[in-house]
Amino acid sequence: MGAALELREVDSELVIKRFTSALPYYEKYAVAQHRIGERLADLLTATGRHHFEHVLEYGCGCGVYTRQLAQTVTVKQWTLNDLCPVCEEYIRVSPVSFYAGEAETMPHTDTYDLITSASAFQWFKDPESFIRTVAGLLRPDGIFLFNTFSPDNLPEIRTITNRGLHYPSTEALMKWLGAAFSAVYKHEEQIVLTFDSPRDVLMHLKRTGVTATPRHEEVWTRSRLARFDQAYRERFSTPDGQVTLTYTPLYFLAK
């Protein structure tokens, strides 16, 4: 089908709309995101740090990762951020302050000993500048822990629809992090989910907000959906008749 169209421009209004619609269903459908949160929590545990004075989490969503963190370490003060104002209703940790708005323009009155984010980094408009900002907000012993995804993320969707989000390369991320931090740890993996049908894949993406892409997307007509279903089954079926969807998370811990 040729090279996939990489979507570099992030439509913040559309992201808010799609993720707000997905929030009531997110915890049930976000299987990969649960695993990613567990991996991030494991990486934090491996540092030997069990308590943090002030934690900042970007892109907290409905709080899945926040709760995983709270079960892993003790935190004196939380600061949570999300683009969607309604996310404040899902907060279950305290004491906490919440900022609704763009992570990259968020005002700060304090520094942090842990800045973290799960599956939100790919939505940032200027990731290189954001990394520099984070480095400036960390205390001397602070940790920056986050994940994003490799350019190979969701290859099934990219192959069939010829569209996909733009993800910075691993090399670019390591370069940016290396310029801002003295030590950087990287880990990558594949998370392969299986579904009964391609339509279930689309429902999963909708219920987790992953469809928050620019407005010029084609409408899912009945004929287009049928073509998608057939092409997906032909290329990405398992021996038992299910279909796959592959996430390729990249994890980074920087000091």
UniProtKB/Swiss-Prot annotation:
Keyword Transferase assigned: yes
GO BP, one annotated term: biotin biosynthetic process
EC code: 2.1.1.197
Enzyme class: transferase
Reaction(s) the record says it catalyses: malonyl-[ACP] + S-adenosyl-L-methionine = malonyl-[ACP] methyl ester + S-adenosyl-L-homocysteine
Pathway: Cofactor biosynthesis; biotin biosynthesis
GO molecular-function term, one example from the UniProt record: carboxyl-O-methyltransferase activity
Keywords from the UniProt entry: Biotin biosynthesis, Methyltransferase, S-adenosyl-L-methionine, Transferase
Job of this protein: Converts the free carboxyl group of a malonyl-thioester to its methyl ester by transfer of a methyl group from S-adenosyl-L-methionine (SAM). It allows to synthesize pimeloyl-ACP via the fatty acid synthetic pathway.
Entry similarity comment: Belongs to the methyltransferase superfamily.
Name of this chain's protein: Malonyl-[acyl-carrier protein] O-methyltransferase
Species the sequence originates in: Porphyromonas gingivalis (strain ATCC BAA-308 / W83)
